[in-house]
Amino acid sequence: MKSTPRLSEILIDSLRVETWIGVPDAERMEAQEIEIDIRIQPARNFAEMRDDINLTVDYAAVCQRVSELARERPRRLIESLAQEICDMILSEFAATSAQVEIRKFILPETRHVAVRCASEATER
């Protein structure tokens, strides 16, 4: 029996990148490792891709671009970086939506702090 695709998503779990991020100037002086989860809804569902890499979102390329973007410049807020990653995915890859969660390991009394954002592509 043939199925009807309802949802196709590409998930990148716990991508570790180094960046300079934090509100205090001293915190941005040294690079720190953050973790990023990314959820991408490609423009085509998996059934339409016919095992063709050119018809999907290349997750290795996404990881490379996220790492480059994170290292591009210092930022105060992980919120800013999360939105920039969503925007980059939607503008550079064939995706209809992107969700990004960034975890930062800065407060000793917590495992991590995190932010999450989700964006949808506007018509191209």
Q: Which ranges hold each PLM region?
A:
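N-terminal, polar/charged subdomain of small-to-medium soluble alpha/beta proteins
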Residues: 1-124
